[in-house]
C-alpha cells in the first residue's frame, strides 16, 4: 500500500523558497483564519495596551496613543503553529523596544494576553532588541479582527500565535 492515499498529492512548496520554510510547513498565498474561540471585536475607543506585572510602574496606551508612537514598516516571513507559512508579509507597528523604554523590570519572561484571555509566555529576550512589534497594519491596511486586530504581537523568529494583544 502506498504511503499516501490515491488522490492526495500533499502540498509542494516552490523549491526556491523551500529554505525559508521550517520543517513541516507549507506555503500559502492566503492568510488563513484559525481561531480557538470567538473573534474579539473591541471598539478602538475602548481598546488599550498595558504593560504590567513585574514592573516598577504599569504603563498603558489607548489606541490613539499607540498610533502616535514612532512606528516601523517591516517585511517578514510568518509561520503559523498550524503549519502554514506566508512569505514576505508587510506590517506596520510599534517596536516592543519603544514600548519598553522607561519600563523598569527584572523580569526574564513575559506573558502576552489577548483579548479573550488567551495567553502565551515568552522570554523577554525574544521580544526585545528589535525582534518584535505590536503591529496594527497588514499590507498597508488596518489589521482585521480575524487576523488579530486591532493590534497583534509579531515575533518573526517564533511561530505565529499572538493574536489581539491587550496586555504584556
Model-derived features: positions:
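Structured, non-membrane catalytic/scaffold regions adjacent to prosthetic-group chemistry
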Residues: 2-167
Amino acid at each position: 500500500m502506498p504511503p499516501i492515499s490515491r488522490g492526495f498529492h500533499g502540498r509542494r512548496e516552490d523549491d526556491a523558497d523551500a529554505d525559508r520554510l521550517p520543517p513541516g510547513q507549507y506555503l500559502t498565498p492566503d492568510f488563513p483564519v484559525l481561531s480557538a474561540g470567538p473573534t474579539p471585536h473591541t471598539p478602538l475607543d475602548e481598546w488599550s495596551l498595558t504593560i504590567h506585572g513585574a514592573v516598577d510602574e504599569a504603563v498603558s496606551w489607548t489606541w490613539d496613543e499607540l498610533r502616535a508612537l514612532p512606528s516601523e514598516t517591516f517585511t517578514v516571513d510568518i509561520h503559523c503553529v498550524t503549519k502554514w507559512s506566508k512569505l514576505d508579509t508587510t506590517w506596520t507597528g510599534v517596536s516592543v523596544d519603544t514600548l519598553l523604554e522607561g519600563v523598569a523590570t527584572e523580569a526574564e519572561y513575559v506573558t502576552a494576553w489577548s483579548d479573550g484571555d488567551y495567553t502565551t509566555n515568552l522570554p523577554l529576550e525574544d521580544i526585545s532588541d528589535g525582534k518584535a512589534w505590536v503591529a496594527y497594519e497588514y499590507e498597508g491596511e488596518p489589521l482585521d479582527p480575524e487576523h488579530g486586530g486591532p493590534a497583534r504581537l509579531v515575533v518573526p523568529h517564533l511561530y505565529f500565535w499572538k493574536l489581539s494583544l491587550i496586555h504584556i
